[in-house]
Amino acid sequence: MAQPVYSWDEAASAGRNAHRMLPGLLRAYFEEGRALASQKATPQELHRLRLATKRFRYTLEVFRPCYGPGLDARLAGLRKIQQQLGEINDCAATGRLLNEHLAPRSPVRARLERFLRARTVQKIAQFKAFWQDHFDRPGELERWTDYLARRTTRRTSAAPRPTAGSAPSAS
């Protein structure tokens, strides 16, 4: 697989850089997500995917002006993945707090651990189902790639902008 392009071309527009860089970042993100959604991933591995999701979403948000509102549905899907993975991480973090603050043989701790295990299993199942439905459908990677690789158009306003030293015309 070809390595994604991560370097910014200062001579190119933001749209041109997006067109050049984002498809590779997308493929790397989908590859990681698919690997973890199709196996028995640990909460720690899923937390790393959450961080990767956050980085990828923030990167796309930087380029939103190049793509316009059509990018919003894709960003919403990434936000949902990030939220689901955050809930899994919350269960793991709560489990660590139980270890630190409750006696090992405490009945309260045992009940809370059972609850957290069940909730973690439930949240992982929800994440995997959402990933399957929204990111792993047949052709989904190609749809994302086509969208991000499309040539972005420069937006221009209807009225010309005044140049330095020129006065706006009175109409």
What are these regions (language model features)?
Residues M1-S171:
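Function-determining surface determinants
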